[in-house]
């Protein structure tokens, strides 16, 4: 598999995971009692402030999905200009790599079991899309 196709596959995997996270966050925002798997896992039903934060996070994760797809070479809209795609995707890679460590350190067994592997695969997928994907000079 050449790097262009690998980048497209990595961007697609990352986007799929991001959309899954967005759906999870949207469900939390709507009141689904999955709080034990989010925001530190301290309570099943999260409060109003965290529900609002989950709603905002859902929107952000949709943007991250679009960025991953575009950086992977797909012809789709992204919330950043093409010249910023690679740096943005590298930044998102670092952010999700930090998320791996934070989820691994969580006191919530549910967060550790669910989000540690999810963020690990997401970080690797974003990293591959960033490294092998669209170049600013070729966009």
What are these regions (language model features)?
Residues 2-11, 29-54, 74-78:
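Interfacial loop at the N-terminal end of multi-pass membrane proteins
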Residues 2-4, 66-84, 107:
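Juxtamembrane helix-break-helix junctions at the cytosolic face
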Residues 6-19, 81-89:
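Interfacial segments of alpha-helical transmembrane regions
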Residues 16, 20, 24-32, 45-73, ...:
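Core segments of alpha-helical transmembrane spans in multipass integral membrane proteins
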Residues 40-47, 80-82, 108-119:
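Non-cytosolic membrane-interface motifs at loop->transmembrane helix junctions
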Residues 86-100:
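Hydrophobic alpha-helical membrane segments
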Residues 100-115, 134:
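Membrane-helix boundary connector in multi-pass membrane proteins
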Residues 122-139:
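Membrane-water interface at the C-terminal end of transmembrane alpha helices
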